[in-house]
């Protein structure tokens, strides 16, 4: 006579739950082993993930940004719960990004190989400037003629109208940077990094580099058309490291992308902001461009204890003649910093 066996039991007398406990424990050990290996591999990439639980997005200090004393945690790290891999990205301009598998294979590290988007005025829905934006620039001593020549436009983002600084290269729109009236910035994603006003320096051997688009426009009001602006602002401090190779110099990719224009210049006047970051930017530019052909602008005094910050501030307060004088009085860049 055959014996009835309960559904929850196997014929050897062990329940299915009992049978699978050792297998589950073994699986946990495998995952733990993978996580330990992954932590070590991440450490080799300069990422300390010891306090980052799997399955949760953790914020860390980016190993590439050099945030100094600010301690900004700009790197987001995600470790997959099964320990198979981890991915990370930095929201600051260094652009560090990567995926690491537990076997140690680095799928990607820097944001290279991205396909550049092709954009047009129509595709990104730019519009002619309204009176409010024109009045904004008029208050900063920037004329409508200068705005028109530089093809400054506007865009509607949600319920807000923002300024659109269009970036052109040989007549082609390659990027666009937006500025709200409350001074918030955003750029079109996955577009080519170039200097603002690039086509204005194609046929000249002497160029001026400023820190922001309004400063480039201000230079034009003072009679200087051979001026470009950096697209990304300034670093907090000068890097203590050697200049990276072209493929790794992501923060200054616009310099490499514009090298065909810049290499023809015999005299480069650096007119960045007079504050700490502005002077750090001046040094980083001079390091890459060659200090022997660079000149540095010192902004005139605003008061006994304070200097003007930038070109647009000089234009607004003192007019085009003093701005022109400041540029003409630029001094040779110190070969030793």
Swiss-Prot record:
GO MF = 5'-3' DNA helicase activity; metal ion binding; nucleotidyltransferase activity; single-stranded DNA binding
Species assigned in the record: Arabidopsis thaliana
Q: What is its EC number?
A: 2.7.7.-
Which residues are recorded as binding Mg(2+) 1? 211, 273
Specify the enzyme's EC class, one word: transferase
Annotated Mg(2+) 2 binding sites: 273, 275
**What is an example of a Pfam family matching this protein?**
Toprim_4
Q: What does this protein do?
A: May act as a DNA primase.
> Which keywords are on file for this protein?
Magnesium, Metal-binding, Nucleotidyltransferase, Transferase
Matching SMART domains, A to Z? TOPRIM
Gene3D superfamilies per record: 3.40.1360.10
Q: Which InterPro entries does this one have?
A: TOPRIM_DnaG/twinkle (IPR034154), TOPRIM_dom (IPR006171), Twinkle-like (IPR027032)
User: What is the name listed in the Swiss-Prot or TrEMBL entry for this protein?
Assistant: Primase homolog protein
Q: How is the cofactor bound?
A: Binds two Mg(2+) per subunit.
Q: In terms of domain of life, where is this protein from?
A: Eukaryota
The protein's required cofactor(s) are namely: Mg(2+)
Report the residue ranges that make up the Toprim domain in this protein.
Answer: 205-304
